From Swiss-Prot:
Signal peptide location: none
Region (Disordered): 62-93
GO term, biological process aspect, one: translation
A cellular component annotation (GO) from this entry: cytosolic large ribosomal subunit
InterPro entries associated with the record: 60S_ribosomal_eL19_sf, Ribosomal_eL19, Ribosomal_eL19_arc, Ribosomal_eL19_CS, Ribosomal_eL19_dom, Ribosomal_eL19_dom1
GO molecular function, one term: structural constituent of ribosome
Protein name per UniProt: Large ribosomal subunit protein eL19
Subunit structure: Part of the 50S ribosomal subunit.
Sorted UniProt keywords: Ribonucleoprotein, Ribosomal protein, RNA-binding, rRNA-binding
Basic residues compositional bias, start-end: 79-88
Keyword ATP-binding: no
SMART domains, per the entry: Ribosomal_L19e
Species, as recorded: Saccharolobus solfataricus (strain ATCC 35092 / DSM 1617 / JCM 11322 / P2)
Biological role: Binds to the 23S rRNA.
């Protein structure tokens, strides 16, 4: 076998790929061996006497299949795989909306059952909107302090 190391190196440099992706067609080995300049090598690549192979990737098909099966079973999502806190993983806006809805429902129930008057309701409602209360229990504590309900 003839030594085409220099020609392959030049072809790789011209094509911008590694040496392993350069292949010389068997019928044109003599032509390639006689060419020494970058211009000659460039012409050989154009003529198809030197072939630049396509990049070989890694197939992700099997991995996708495995991941899909795991996601269908909800694997890898339980407490052992979680690194962040609940607040880091959950959408903070959704958490806020959920909390505010609970508090508002509680306030509405209190107003409808005549536990608090509409002025107190409005005051607490606006404070809830402003983010004063962490939850329903916080609102209960405030109402106990106000003397509106018994502890």
């Amino acid at each position: 076998m003839t030594n085409l190391k220099a020609q392959k190196r030049l072809a790789a440099s011209i094509a911008g790929v590694g040496i392993n992706r350069i292949k010389v067609v068997e019928d044109y080995i003599e032509d390639v061996q006689s060419s020494l300049t970058r211009d000659e090598i460039r012409n050989l690549i154009k003529d198809g006497k030197i072939i630049v192979l396509k990049k070989v990737g890694i197939s992700g098909g099997r991995l996708k299949e495995r991941r899909k099966k795991r996601s269908l079973k909800s694997e890898g999502k339980k407490s052992g795989s979680r690194k962040g806190k609940k607040g880091a993983r959950a959408n903070s806006k959704q958490m806020w909306v959920k909390r505010v809805r609970k508090i508002r429902a509680y306030l509405k129930w209190l107003r409808d059952h005549k536990v608090i008057d509409r002025h107190t309701y409005r005051e607490l409602y606006l404070k809830t909107k402003g983010g004063n209360y962490k939850g329903v229990s916080d609102v209960r504590n405030v109402l106990i302090q106000m003397g509106k309900i018994k502890g």
